[in-house]
């Protein structure tokens, strides 16, 4: 009985550890709202909004540029002019911007995700 328990526990531990290693998501650089707010006036950074045009037109971080997540990769040539800058990518909650950050990194940009997106943003907002 003890042998069965030891074997069962060992198998469970191996399966558990394997699933943790296998499902470990790729990490991306992330900024908090507070950190992002400090960078807003830094000319070495640009903020890119990957929400829909309607969301961006309603409210957005001042001086941010808009490229919807759906069009981001196909418009990468338009973003090339920002290659020398660090890019802060944001959306409503941080999900779309996480995808956008990965796309930009894939193309060689220095990009980071604004954690929590507009839901967590405490800085200034332009309302149109």
Spans of model-derived segments:
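Metallo-beta-lactamase
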Residues: 89-91
């Amino acid at each position: 009985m003890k042998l069965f328990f030891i074997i069962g526990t060992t198998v469970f531990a191996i399966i558990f550890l394997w699933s943790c290693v296998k499902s470990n998501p790729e990490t991306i650089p992330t900024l908090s709202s507070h950190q992002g707010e400090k960078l807003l006036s830094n000319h070495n950074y640009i903020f890119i909004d990957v929400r829909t045009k309607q969301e961006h037109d309603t409210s957005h971080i001042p001086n941010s540029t808009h490229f919807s997540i759906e069009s981001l990769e196909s418009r990468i040539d338009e973003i090339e002019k920002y290659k020398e800058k660090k890019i802060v990518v944001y959306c409503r909650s941080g999900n779309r911007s996480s995808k956008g950050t990965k796309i930009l990194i894939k193309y060689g940009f220095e990009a980071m995700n604004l954690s929590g997106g507009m839901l967590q943003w405490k800085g200034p907002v332009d309302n149109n």
